[in-house]
Swiss-Prot record:
Pathway participation: Purine metabolism; IMP biosynthesis via de novo pathway; 5-amino-1-(5-phospho-D-ribosyl)imidazole-4-carboxamide from 5-amino-1-(5-phospho-D-ribosyl)imidazole-4-carboxylate: step 1/2
Database matches in InterPro entries: SAICAR_synt/ADE2_N (IPR028923), SAICAR_synth (IPR001636), SAICAR_synthetase_CS (IPR018236)
Family, as annotated: Belongs to the SAICAR synthetase family.
Catalytic activity as recorded in UniProt: 5-amino-1-(5-phospho-D-ribosyl)imidazole-4-carboxylate + L-aspartate + ATP = (2S)-2-[5-amino-1-(5-phospho-beta-D-ribosyl)imidazole-4-carboxamido]succinate + ADP + phosphate + 2 H(+)
EC number of the protein: 6.3.2.6
Family matches, as CDD domains: SAICAR_synt_Sc (cd01414)
Keywords, alphabetical: ATP-binding, Ligase, Nucleotide-binding, Purine biosynthesis
Short name of any one Pfam family annotated for the protein: SAICAR_synt
Domain of life of the organism encoding this protein: Eukaryota
Protein name: Phosphoribosylaminoimidazole-succinocarboxamide synthase
GO molecular function terms listed in the Swiss-Prot or TrEMBL record: ATP binding; phosphoribosylaminoimidazolesuccinocarboxamide synthase activity
Length: 291
């Protein structure tokens, strides 16, 4: 399911790369994770079956696991809003009722391993995103670093920025708090995932404000927002076996269509990408996935 239509029951206020967002009331939003998938900032023409449900369940797992206030409103949406019952086939298993908060306008990225272009930069200058990194000998693992980016509008590209630039966008005091919280959350998740045979190479968090309290929002530590690697098959300085959409990125690159609009994935690529997401869910939660 790549789009939703609640026929005006609640107004659709945003349609992102993956989520359709409806306004329930002045203080409440309904997030619906569709099966859309994007790579290189472009949405594919077709989706990954039940991907939105996997993202939703995994986000719920991490919201419960991580020691920070989040935007979730607990309870059955169909009991709270009986008018949604007729849209159960669109909403069940892929919807989150959340508090409407003031969003912090940063993509909060934490990197614990040197990946991709970062590895190329490191081998030249021993820096990652301009941040000095010491010697990395036996692995690409580093002390986690905060590498923010801008939050681009739909169809635009996020832009990597420095901590100092982020300070100017949100204020240094708030940015310092965000950096510490994000690195602490990443570290807790990284250490847990390591016990499940998964390396979290990097991840993207998003935060909102409830007064001056920083609140975790959006999706959390999913294959869409993170790089998950197999610890057992890890190889220094090489392309890693991953449980995320790197598989799709690799296919797009190999076929010369990375970043092009309107590209449809062959069925086998969609199936194999879904399997990566299922493996991430099962390994991290210890639960068997059921469509």
């Amino acid at each position: 399911m790549t789009s939703t239509n609640l026929e005006g029951t609640f107004p659709l206020i945003a349609r992102g790369k993956v989520r359709d967002i409806y306004q329930v009331d002045d203080n409440t939003l309904l997030f619906v994770a569709t099966d859309r998938i994007s790579a290189y900032d472009v949405i594919m023409a077709n989706g990954i079956p039940n991907k939105g449900k996997i993202l939703t369940k995994l986000s719920e797992f991490w919201f419960a696991f991580l020691p920070i206030d989040n935007h979730l409103i607990k309870g059955d949406i169909f009991e709270k809003y009986p008018q949604l019952e007729k849209y159960r086939d669109q909403l069940e298993g892929r919807s989150l009722l959340v508090r409407k908060l003031k969003l912090i306008p940063l993509e909060v990225i934490v990197r614990g391993y040197i990946t991709g272009s970062g590895w190329k930069e490191y081998t030249k200058s021993k820096t990652v995103h301009g941040i000095p990194i010491g010697d990395v000998v036996e692995s690409q693992q580093i002390t986690p670093i905060f590498t923010p980016s801008t939050k681009a509008e739909q169809g635009e590209h996020d832009e990597n920025i420095t901590k100092e630039q982020a300070d100017k966008i949100v204020g240094k005091e708030l940015c310092d708090r965000i950096e510490k919280i994000a690195i602490d959350l990443y570290t807790k998740a990284r250490d847990y995932a390591a016990t499940k045979g998964i390396i979290i190479a990097d991840t993207k968090f998003e935060f909102g404000l409830d007064g001056d309290k920083i609140v975790l929002v959006d999706e959390v530590l999913t294959p869409d927002s993170s790089r998950f690697w197999s610890a057992a098959k890890y190889k220094l300085g090489q392309s890693q076996e991953s449980y995320d959409k790197q598989f799709l990125r690799d296919w797009l690159t190999a076929n010369g269509v990375a970043g092009k609009d309107g590209v449809a994935m062959p069925e086998d690529i969609a199936v194999q990408t879904k399997q990566k997401y299922v493996e991430a869910y099962e390994n991290l939660t210890g639960e068997k996935w059921q469509d």
